[in-house]
Every structure is written in structure tokens, then in C-alpha cells.
Amino acid sequence: MANVSIRKYKNSDYETVNFLFVEGTKEHLPAACWNTLKKPRFYFIIIVACASIFMCTSSYVLSLTSLVALLAVGWYGLYLEFHGYASRCQREDMLDIENSYMMSDNTCFWVAEIDRKVVGIVGAKPLKEADDELFLLHLSVARDCRQQRIGTKLCQTVIDFARQRGFKAVCLETANIQDAAIKLYEAVGFKKSLVAIPPFLLNQYTSFTVIYYRYDIKS
């Protein structure tokens, strides 16, 4: 196993950090699509739509074309959700990481390195709703460096930071399609606190849910 070191973010890390963040966000799109394809409701909609078009036109070509169009629209809708999230973050806290995370005692951003190459990232800042709870966000590890406990070390770094700063808990959110992330957080010791349905247009067909986790820090 490679020697992994965790250190605080520097401005010279920006391009690599941004790449890991965007790639880590985009890679969930196939899982979201597959999750949608497994839902009976989705197949019901497809069958009804194609059957209706065939009954109106008696054309197999138009029916198949409508099937392809529906799949394309569904994929594009999911793409817009993930792309929109990444773009929004790049306009907000990820636009200037130094200013967003490194200028306060209670916020921080870390990178994981192997042989001086940045292979993982994570950030932490207090929750707006509860200033005694720290929010873990933007955890991402390069694909070719997984299964080396890098995610675990980054999570533990945030927990240690929270404990040193006197926070009562570390909170985070993930999605039901992120199986690896869920296993990681639960292995570290995070407990599920809430499951919510996000209010985006296609969610009634995708069964996409947001899972909130909490790690209580013992005093």
C-alpha cells in the first residue's frame, strides 16, 4: 500500500483539486441512470408512451424513435442535475478555495498525497443552521488510487479537526446511488440521521434520495 499523507490545501493545488471535484461529481451520472432503469415506474412510463404512439401512428419506427427520445431526455435531465451542482460549487466555495476554507479557524480544506501527487480532497465548514456542527463536503479520491483507505483518512482528518475545535458533531450528505461512499461513511462511524427526497423534476421517476449522516464527537 502506498504511503499517503494528508496536508492542508495550497493555492498551487487548485487545478488538480478542481479536476478531482468535477470528476468525482460526474462519475455518479451512470449510477443515477442505472438506478432509474431499475425502477418499474420508469418501464411503465416507457411502455405506455410507446404503445400510445404506436396506436396513433401504427409505426414501429416512430415508436422506437420515441423510446430513444425518452431515454435521451431522461439522461439529459440527470446530466443537468449533476453538471448544475458542479457548476454551482465552482461559482461559489470552489471558485476560491483559499478564501472559502483557509481564512478561518473553523474551516479547512485538505488534500491527500501519494509521492507528492494530489489524489484526494475534502473540505469542512460549520453548518449554517448549527454552528456547533461541522459539515464535511467535497470528499473525492482519484479513481486509480481507491481501495487504499484514503477516503477513511480524509474523513478522520475532518473528525480530528472538529474535535480539536470543540464541535459536537460532523455532518455530511450523500446520495442513495453512492454505494461506495455509504459504505465508507458507515465504516468510519457515521450514523444515518435523515433520508430526504430532493425537489428536482425527474425525481418522481428516479427514486433519487439524499442521505444525511452524523458523527457525534464524544467529549
UniProtKB/Swiss-Prot annotation:
The chain crosses the membrane at residues 42-62, 64-84. SUPFAM superfamilies: Acyl-CoA N-acyltransferases (Nat). Its main location: Golgi. InterPro entries: Acyl_CoA_acyltransferase, GNAT_dom, NAT_camello-type. GO terms for molecular function: N-acetyltransferase activity. It is found in: Golgi apparatus membrane. CDD domains: NAT_SF (cd04301). Its EC number is 2.3.1.-. The keyword Transmembrane helix applies. Signal peptide: none annotated. One of its GO terms (biological process) is negative regulation of cell adhesion. It holds the Pfam family Acetyltransf_1. At the beginning of gastrulation, expressed in deep cells of the presumptive mesoderm. At later gastrulation stages, expressed at the interface between already involuted and preinvoluted mesoderm. At late neurula and tailbud stages, expressed in the deep mass of cells lying ventrally and laterally to the closed blastopore. Residues 62-218 form the N-acetyltransferase domain. Keywords: Acyltransferase, Developmental protein, Gastrulation, Golgi apparatus, Membrane, Transferase, Transmembrane, Transmembrane helix. Disulfide bonds: none annotated. One of its GO terms (cellular component) is Golgi membrane. The keyword ATP-binding does not apply. It is a multi-pass membrane protein. Plays a role in regulation of gastrulation, possibly by controlled reduction of cell adhesion which is necessary for optimal cell motility. Belongs to the camello family. This is Probable N-acetyltransferase camello. The lineage of its organism: Eukaryota, Metazoa, Chordata, Craniata, Vertebrata.
